[in-house]
Amino acid sequence: METLTFSCHSLGKIMTPTRGKSNIDKYNDAVELLASTNTKYNETKNNETKNKETKAAINLLEKITELKAQVKELELIKDDVILSETAKSYIEEIWLRNNYGYKDTVITHELIKGIVCEKESIELLVENDSEYREKNTEFFKNDYIHGSPDVILEEVIEDVKNSWTLKTFFKADISSDYYWQGQGYMDLTGKKKYKLTYVLSDTPPEIVTKEINWQMAKLSYAVTDGCFDKDKIAEQIRKNHTFSHLPIEKRIKVFEFEYNESDINKLYKTIDAARIYYNSISL
């Protein structure tokens, strides 16, 4: 049976935090509370005018006994991974695809633009800083993850993201998905630095036309009744997708972060848990 591995672009899904505290957080909290309770007990013994059998001291001793038992129990499971519901849902999707060929088809204008404009975006980066780049075609994999970064430079992995509009470019940041994707690519390639680059490329006319038609379809009755000006809406949509008049430096946004071995260890432990869950699924 083939071992389940995950693509780097999906790592953010399985690393989605669970609601509430993790086992390690619960363990650390219990250890901290035990230490502070021990301190209070010692202070109580020293400050009491009577002996250590006072009511306050007895209560604290009982609390310490309970906490020691709790710490002992939590220590056994502190490294166990609790998968989030998002992670479980994604693992179930993989199971359905692998076992029955089922796969949701989600194709958006944003996705199409990202694919179509990838080469143009890389060329824009070269024009901006004169550093030679070319689209990476090498596929990397290990026992846990696999993927193919956009660009591999001498010391840096660079992933290029095409922003849909000026608004999405303005709000662009290091999302959890892109963080884990970057960590995965660095681990696969041995690079220690990751550059997440957002680029504003003009949306291809055919995609803009489809976007206009889609928006018009949503407003069909309102447009027919004269509530909206069809030409003005189309003009605004075209404007929202045209950026070539802007200076190049205004069309590029870069975020950088470094390889984190501790996070990679967490990732692989989570994948171990994901495999166990995967093998427990049935129709």
Report the location of each language-model feature.
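Charged, glycine-rich intrinsically disordered N-terminal tails and low-complexity linkers that flank
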Residues: 1-116, 120, 124, 205, ...
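Nucleic-acid nuclease catalytic cores
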Residues: 128-275
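C-terminal helix/juxtamembrane-tail motif
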Residues: 273-283
